Structures are given as structure tokens and as C-alpha cells.
């Protein structure tokens, strides 16, 4: 199927019209209104060079917060209080860290300057959030994503020290459990996400869950939290996670 060509009008075709690879539409812009509409519709942008490509894969990996997998090694890392974790303290450093951090399975980045500007604006509007992992006074890992209703859309994460990105998502999961979030939308499946507990579900089921989640109140205020002792997160998750 040919991808839908977007114009100035804020509209997307239904995700079920995506091609077998998940490509749904081409063009448009990264304005806050269009991005929020996309995420609420089960669609996300992913491209290296213009035009902007919009996707809605036929299968969607979700992490349900209480089904997050905390491995024994991650539990031990959290217990050691090696890192300090904060939310929304330095969004720009985190998104640029995700854009520039070396990755074994990639030679480039899809996080362009245009994307950085667009998501930084969403952060200022209270929809995009960052998790920073600190070692001494340096950010050594983190993640960022979008929050709408009680759905969190994970965009990217990075790590410069052992388990730093896993520590970030652990603290995020604690926050999501405390605030009754439905899921983390991981967008595209990979082995790392599966190890963290992601379930791959059909798009049709995802859209049903999404519709309910985004109708809830959005926490658009700054997520101003500090985790000075990640050992407390380890204890919390051990008590709250459902064994698998």
C-alpha cells in the first residue's frame, strides 16, 4: 500500500492502513499538535532524512509497569547505590546523549537536530520527560519519552556506564506504578526490550489499550523527582513487580 501524503491539515489515516513494515504516512511537520495527535493515534515519527516518515507497526512491544523484568544483576546494581537518578533536570543533555552515544547495532542516529528541537519544545510544554542517571556530577545514562494520559511512549535511552540505562528505566517504572500508568510503548521490538519484560501485542489490541490510557489526565507538570538511593527503588520493585 502507498503511504499517505500529509499536508498542512492535522490528520492521520487510520493505523490499520500502514504497509506491512508499518509505514503509514509521509510528510507533515513535527509541531507539538501533530506529534501529540500522532502518539494518541498509535503513530510515531522515525526517519533519518526528510521527508518525515510516520509509522504504526503491526505488532507493538509494550512494557506493563508491574510486569517489568528486574534481573538479579540489575537488582544488585540498584542495591549498591552507585548512581543518583533525577527526572526532568537536563532534558537536552539526555536527548543529545541518546543521539550521539555509540551503539553496537547502528552506525548513525535517527535523532536529528529537528527532532531535538521538536521534543525539547514538547518538554517545555510538559509532555516530554527525561530520566538522568548521574555518577558523581556527570550524566552517564538516561532516557526520554512522551507522556499522554496514562501512557508513556519511550523514545530512546543511552548508557555510558554499566547498567545506567537499566537503572533509568527502573526508576521510571517505579514512577509509572505510583501514578497508575498503563504501559510503556516501546514502538519497535528488540532483544534488549524483551529482556526488560516487553510483550509484543497486535496493533489492534494496542489501539484499544491506547484509547483508554490517553483519555486519563495527563501529568503535564515537571516530573521533579530525585532518587538519591536507588536501593529504595530496588526494594519497591521487588515488592510491587508481579513474578514472571
Curated annotation (Swiss-Prot):
InterPro entries: Acyl_CoA_acyltransferase, Leu/Phe-tRNA_Trfase, Leu/Phe-tRNA_Trfase_C, Leu/Phe-tRNA_Trfase_N. GO terms for biological process: protein catabolic process. It is found in: Cytoplasm. GO terms for cellular component: cytoplasm. The keyword Nucleotide-binding does not apply. Its main location: cytoplasm. GO terms for molecular function: leucyl-tRNA--protein transferase activity. It comes from the Bacteria. Signal peptide: none annotated. Keywords: Acyltransferase, Cytoplasm, Transferase. Its EC number is 2.3.2.6. It catalyses: N-terminal L-lysyl-[protein] + L-leucyl-tRNA(Leu) = N-terminal L-leucyl-L-lysyl-[protein] + tRNA(Leu) + H(+); N-terminal L-arginyl-[protein] + L-leucyl-tRNA(Leu) = N-terminal L-leucyl-L-arginyl-[protein] + tRNA(Leu) + H(+); L-phenylalanyl-tRNA(Phe) + an N-terminal L-alpha-aminoacyl-[protein] = an N-terminal L-phenylalanyl-L-alpha-aminoacyl-[protein] + tRNA(Phe). Functions in the N-end rule pathway of protein degradation where it conjugates Leu, Phe and, less efficiently, Met from aminoacyl-tRNAs to the N-termini of proteins containing an N-terminal arginine or lysine. Belongs to the L/F-transferase family. NCBIfam families: aat. This is Leucyl/phenylalanyl-tRNA--protein transferase. It comes from Thermodesulfovibrio yellowstonii (strain ATCC 51303 / DSM 11347 / YP87). The gene is aat.
